[in-house]
Amino acid sequence: MAKTVAYFYDPDVGNFHYGTGHPMKPHRLSLTHSLVLHYGLYKKMIVFKPYQASQHDMCRFHSEDYIDFLQRVSPNNMQGFTKSLNAFNVGDDCPVFPGLFEFCSRYTGASLQGATQLNNKICDIAINWAGGLHHAKKFEASGFCYVNDIVIGILELLKYHPRVLYVDIDIHHGDGVQEAFYLTDRVMTVSFHKYGNYFFPGTGDMYEVGAESGRYYCLNVPLRDGIDDQSYRHLFQPVIKQVIDFYQPTCIVLQCGADSLGCDRLGCFNLSIRGHGECVQYVKSFNIPLLVLGGGGYTVRNVARCWTYETSLLVDETISEELPYSEYFEYFAPDFTLHPDVSTRIENQNSRQYLDQIRQTIFENLKMLNHAPSVQIHDVPSDILSYERTDEPDPEERGSEDNYSRPEASNEFYDGDHDNDKESDVEI
């Protein structure tokens, strides 16, 4: 039976700019959406311009002091916030940039709206490529992430769902989400990531398993450099199958960070776009309500290819290898294809013996789980959002410029892998 897929896209979200030389580029969202449109994938989805999250929404997880700071700070007044900048870890990796709070509001609102639509059975799958900012903590920013839209979305899902499974395939450990739900069995977190050699964020050892009621409801799969499609599949599919069999989640949140692809600027894995997509396809195959989010990904053209391909998998549509012409066509030179070779010369340091050892340890931990913990459901709080949305604009039409209040950053275009912006010679 065909799935109903809701797709959330804010036309302004790709026009925010972390600053010259910064590897995180919201502009990748504009590229992704352009491909989704030009491949005609929007015809297979319900397209929403998302809700913007309020301070109140963000404070469901974050501290009021921190969110109040995010709303008040700007590049023009940040000199007066020296103490707060340090306290909230805002500075180099997480800079203050124009429209910072508005950016957080837009990507968080989309994840929250996706969760609410899943709760109300408006859709079977909700997609927000702008979300998935998994490093943000209750009291501070971290790793290019300010507001943890994933945690806020999961808190909304928990109003209706007794058990939510969180799966993270970003190359970086999903530390902010793990920390938020470390003490509960209502959410099981499963993260596949690079671990060791001081790789950010430095957490995600196999022996971090949760505590108190959440003991054994946190599962980490620490990987080494150079993992390829075959090795990843050897771990991912059996682990996810066992987790779903044991935990029986009623909803799944999947963070699809694309920095686990080969050739990523900040990554050291060797997954192909097809291999990354295979994980999405596998999770979808369980037919459990699914919230799909973005995350990391710093080689912009490959992020757009990856998330477009995964959108096609989620709507069961085969798309051509040749990219359609679009306003961003030149980004995809020289091949202009959906699945270029992204393999690198990084050696796969994940031996079969190492992978089997991880698998064995994980399966032993899973045996410690109570099968599908039951939960006492109290009165369900009212939904944050109600939508009888009949006013959706045609996504094929650009619409008036009034809908695009934030112009594209003039230094957002760049050439090649080492030029981050046309005004910068900083190599990342």
From Swiss-Prot:
Residues noted as binding Zn(2+) in the record, renumbered to the chain: D170, H172, D259
Region (Disordered): 386-428
EC number, as in UniProt: 3.5.1.98, 3.5.1.-
Cellular compartments annotated: Nucleus; Chromosome; Cytoplasm, Cytosol
Keyword match Glycosyltransferase: no
Residues the record lists as binding 1D-myo-inositol 1,4,5,6-tetrakisphosphate: H17, G21, K25, R265
Gene3D superfamilies, alphabetized: Histone deacetylase domain
Basic and acidic residues compositional bias, start-end: 386-405, 415-428
UniProt keyword Transcription regulation present: yes
InterPro entries per UniProt: HDAC_PDAC (IPR050284), His_deacetylse (IPR000286), His_deacetylse_1 (IPR003084), His_deacetylse_dom (IPR023801), His_deacetylse_dom_sf (IPR037138), Ureohydrolase_dom_sf (IPR023696)
CDD domains in alphabetical order: HDAC3 (cd10005)
Record's keyword terms, sorted: Biological rhythms, Chromatin regulator, Chromosome, Cytoplasm, Hydrolase, Metal-binding, Nucleus, Repressor, Transcription, Transcription regulation, Zinc
Cellular component GO terms held in the UniProt record: chromosome; cytoplasm; cytosol; nucleus; transcription repressor complex
Pfam family, one: Hist_deacetyl
Residue ranges of the region described as Histone deacetylase: 3-316
Molecular functions (GO terms): chromatin binding; histone deacetylase activity, hydrolytic mechanism; histone decrotonylase activity; metal ion binding; protein de-2-hydroxyisobutyrylase activity; protein decrotonylase activity; protein lysine deacetylase activity; protein lysine delactylase activity
GO biological process: circadian regulation of gene expression; negative regulation of transcription by RNA polymerase II; regulation of circadian rhythm
Active site: H135
SUPFAM superfamilies, sorted: Arginase/deacetylase (SSF52768)
Domain of life per record: Eukaryota
Catalytic activity: N(6)-acetyl-L-lysyl-[histone] + H2O = L-lysyl-[histone] + acetate; N(6)-acetyl-L-lysyl-[protein] + H2O = L-lysyl-[protein] + acetate; N(6)-(2E)-butenoyl-L-lysyl-[protein] + H2O = (2E)-2-butenoate + L-lysyl-[protein]; N(6)-(2-hydroxyisobutanoyl)-L-lysyl-[protein] + H2O = 2-hydroxy-2-methylpropanoate + L-lysyl-[protein]
Similarity section: Belongs to the histone deacetylase family. HD type 1 subfamily.
Protein task: Histone deacetylase that catalyzes the deacetylation of lysine residues on the N-terminal part of the core histones (H2A, H2B, H3 and H4), and some other non-histone substrates. Histone deacetylation gives a tag for epigenetic repression and plays an important role in transcriptional regulation, cell cycle progression and developmental events. Histone deacetylases act via the formation of large multiprotein complexes, such as N-Cor repressor complex, which activate the histone deacetylase activity.
UniProt name for this protein: Histone deacetylase 3
Species whose genome carries this gene: Xenopus tropicalis (Western clawed frog)
Organism classification: Eukaryota, Metazoa, Chordata, Craniata, Vertebrata
